[in-house]
From Swiss-Prot:
Protein name per Swiss-Prot or TrEMBL: Capsid assembly scaffolding protein
Taxonomic lineage of the native organism: Viruses, Duplodnaviria, Heunggongvirae, Uroviricota, Caudoviricetes
UniProt function note: Scaffolding protein involved in the icosahedric procapsid assembly. Coassembles with the capsid proteins to form the procapsid, in which the scaffolding protein is found within the external shell of icosahedrally arranged capsid protein subunits. In a subsequent step the scaffolding protein molecules are released from the procapsid.
Alphabetized InterPro entries for the sequence: SCAF (IPR009636)
Subunit structure: Homodimer.
Annotated organism of origin: Lactococcus phage LL-H (Lactococcus delbrueckii bacteriophage LL-H)
One matching Pfam family: Phage_scaffold
GO biological process: viral capsid assembly
Keyword Cell membrane attached: no
Highest taxon in the source lineage: Viruses
Keywords of this entry: Viral capsid assembly, Viral release from host cell
Family: Belongs to the SPP1-like scaffolding protein family.
Amino acid sequence: MERKFLTDLGLNPDQVNSIMAQYGKDMQEYEGLEAERDALKKTSSELSSKIEDLKANSANVEELTKQIEKLKSDNENATKQLNAQKLDFAVTSTIKDFGAKNAKAVKALLNHDDIRFDSKGNLIGLEDQLKSLKDSDSYLFAEDKPAGKPIQAFPTGNPVAGGKDVSLHQKIAQRLKG
């Protein structure tokens, strides 16, 4: 996200700074989760390669079989952990997309047993829960504020820059002259 984009949308500098600060926090959290995910992927691939190495070197079959079973178990655990993290990241991301003010509070109110990925990798069961939660506990979510009318500084409207309108200063000077 770039400051110029937000400025072009008509946001003032304070609003842009606030948005950029929150965006920076979200990106740090996202990068931390990505690093953790990558570490789990690396662990999973290392365990898979160790399993293959043990299969190739079958000097002591019984001991190697035990090691293979242990590595398979470790690999399954790492895969489960990776999938759980992937699901957690997707849930957190979707909660933020729904405009939650506090993702942890919203996440605590969800039934995680009903949330899962389908065969195409899409989340199932989360959107309905978030919609019903947004209806019942709307205070947890940011309001969608419609764009309001601009404030008029003058009762006849704001003067047009470079227009024929006489400035307020000139009107006061004319009134004082008589």
